[in-house]
Amino acid sequence: DDKELKKQLLRKYSGCLGNLRKELCKKRKKDKLPKEARQKLLSWWELHYRWPYPSEMEKIALAESTGLEQKQINNWFINQRKRHWKPS
């Protein structure tokens, strides 16, 4: 019967489900960058809109001034170009 099967499955997999919930909660918290960091990145973006590809040195400087990792800087620019840039 369905109720018995449900009970068995819950008994067998409840630990896994709990771990999955914890993992999902951890990952959800990482979605937004701090407001100040976003503002600094957007300022750079606006100044360089025609060619929004920071050099490695500029990425290092942005990482230091925002407190973000360089990978986060790279990902932000990739996403920003994909979503908002219309090359002229």
UniProtKB/Swiss-Prot annotation:
Pfam families: ELK (PF03789), Homeobox_KN (PF05920)
Protein name, UniProt field: Homeobox protein knotted-1-like 3
GO molecular function: DNA binding; DNA-binding transcription factor activity, RNA polymerase II-specific
Entry comment describing in which tissues the protein is expressed: Strongly expressed in ear inflorescence primordia and shoot meristem. Weakly expressed in embryos. Absent from leaves.
Protein source organism: Zea mays
Chain residues forming the annotated DNA-binding region: 25-88
InterPro entries to which the protein is assigned, alphabetical: ELK_dom, HD, Homeobox_CS, Homeodomain-like_sf, KN_HD, TALE_homeobox
ELK domain mapped to chain residues: 4-24
Function per UniProt: Probably binds to the DNA sequence 5'-TGAC-3'.
Any single Gene Ontology cellular-component annotation: nucleus
Family in the record: Belongs to the TALE/KNOX homeobox family.
Subcellular location as annotated: Nucleus
Alphabetized CDD domains for the sequence: homeodomain
Record keywords: DNA-binding, Homeobox, Nucleus
